[in-house]
Amino acid sequence: MRVPEVLIKKIFKIANHYGEDAQVDMLIEEMSELTKALLKNRRAQKGQTDTPVRATVNAIEEEVADVLIMLHQIIYLGDFEDLEDIIEEKLDRQLERIEAEKEQQ
């Protein structure tokens, strides 16, 4: 998902206002909320809660949005230089693992 420039500007403005320490804390909180939403969805799919599955999917979507917003802020505030290269290396490594798995089958 590509984030439109207008949203990036808003994200950066918020990041600049609150600063890195506060936004790292907020990212940790939002990731925790996403974890809880994912677990609740898993329970809903197994019929272990009264919450409808659709409601848990909506909650996951909300929390993913929060985490993505916070990640964009941390990336911006952290001024990481090698992030794209690291991501590409990790993706390539996983694709190599997938190919190796296919060869073993």
Regions found by a protein language model. Give the residues of each.
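Flexible "arm" and connector segments at domain edges
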Residues: 1-105
